[in-house]
Amino acid sequence: MENNQKRQQSGMSRRSFLKVGAAATTMGVIGAIKAPAKVANAAETLNYVPGSGKIRSKLRPVHDFAGAKVRFVENNDQWLGTTKILTKVKMTSEADAGFMQAVRGLYGPEPQKGFFQFIAKDPFGGSISWARNLIAPEDVVDGAPEATKTPIPDPEQMSQHIRDCCYFLRADEVGIGKMPEYGYYTHHVADTVGLMTKPVEECVTPVTKIYPNVIVVMIDQGIETMWASTGYDGISGAMSMKSYFTSGCIAVILAKYIRTLGYNARAHHAKNYEAIMPVCIMAAGLGELSRTGDSAIHPRLGFRHKVAAVTTDLPLAPDQPLDFGLLDFCRVCKKCADNCPNEAISFDEDPIEYNGYLRWNSDFRKCTEFRTTNEEGSSCGTCMKVCPWNSKEDSWFHKAGVWVGSKGETASTFLKSIDDIFGYGTETIEKYKWWLEWPEKYVMK
């Protein structure tokens, strides 16, 4: 407790110092930074193209990238955004995802038991999670479209309309992408509890509805709540559940709306997935794959988001994948790896080949084990909390730092150092804590 108070006081004093004294330092370093050669040549490698220049949304005309230098990458078979595709990417079953492997007992009895407790043991997070069941049934996420198609505008205008619908429903970010085939699971887990005792093939159903477009809805988990959280306390799970539920509600409404217009549309959210969300995020121009290996970072929100998606055959004009320098940044930062409570995140310098593409090879078993058995709270979001790409404050100096961090490896080292100096991500700020903790409920039963 004493250490937390010291960190809090230190963090606040550093913020005050930064607000009055960091301008000259930051501007001086910005002027001195030069991107490495491989970054300078990236445009030729990735085939950068400018944005369309057309209005993307009447309610939100431009993305809020918090000052990051964002480049747009064309869609092709060799790259998904900045993720290099080496060979044909193999499609995977949802039954092989980390949490499902825990349910199957592949990580031992404690994570298997913990999966059914780790959210519910926090009364608030468990209540939000319960509400997700209301939008989980197949007849809620999917259904037959109207027999007659309603005349619709051209794909560009329809895409603008779809984004506006999502923003009206209180999405924080929205993206539209071309859906790669490997973005779908081969099989969807239809009987999670059954995985404990039954053969996998009796618990899954094949994914057969492969649509060409994906709409991704992103919800902010809450910056002030994150400031007050340790990253693995009681509110950690509830932050995720709130964003899962909210994005899921928007997705099922949007899918129903599209079906009413006469087009196929299926919602995908945390209680009923047939699609892989990191792939959807990258395809829809909302993030890049990070050092964690299975999570995508948004230029403004960092990890501080959850998403749902709608796959559809509605004619749409896709957004372009992003490059805001994350690969070079993650290569040198390693702050998530330094702070991971179960040492699950890789310290490797470079991504390695996995399943036909390049990613950092983190230990997903260790990650799942800690999240399902954590007795100090509910789940874990430490990597989210400490990541410098979370815009910790809506201020010029943090936006300047984000801009610097998107300029290459040398600049990335600077942003990470500034993040550390001013205590971002490692302090807990008590004045923003609004929830109750229930430590007696966090112990595994």
Swiss-Prot record:
Enzyme Commission number, as recorded: 3.8.1.-
Localization, UniProt: Cell membrane
Post-translational modification: Predicted to be exported by the Tat system. The position of the signal peptide cleavage has been experimentally proven.
Domain of life of the organism encoding this protein: Bacteria
GO MF annotation list: 4 iron, 4 sulfur cluster binding; hydrolase activity; metal ion binding
Signal peptide interval: 1-42
Keyword vocabulary terms for this entry: 4Fe-4S, Cell membrane, Hydrolase, Iron, Iron-sulfur, Membrane, Metal-binding, Repeat, Signal
Main location: membrane
Any one GO cellular component localisation term in the record: plasma membrane
Quaternary structure and interacting proteins, as annotated: Monomer.
Record PANTHER family: IRON-SULFUR CLUSTER-BINDING PROTEIN (PTHR42827:SF1), IRON-SULFUR CLUSTER-BINDING PROTEIN-RELATED (PTHR42827)
Cofactor(s) essential for the protein: [4Fe-4S] cluster; corrinoid
Binding site for [4Fe-4S] cluster: 330, 333, 336, 340
Cofactor annotation remark: Binds 1 [4Fe-4S] cluster.
Membrane topology, record value: Peripheral membrane protein
4Fe-4S ferredoxin-type domain sequence ranges: 320-350, 368-397
UniProt cross-references to InterPro entries, sorted A to Z: 4Fe4S_Fe-S-bd, 4Fe4S_Fe_S_CS, RDH, TAT_signal, TAT_signal_bac_arc
Name of the protein: 3-chloro-4-hydroxyphenylacetate reductive dehalogenase
Function according to Swiss-Prot or TrEMBL: Catalyzes the reductive dechlorination of C1-OHPA to 4-hydroxyphenylacetate with reduced methyl viologen as the electron donor.
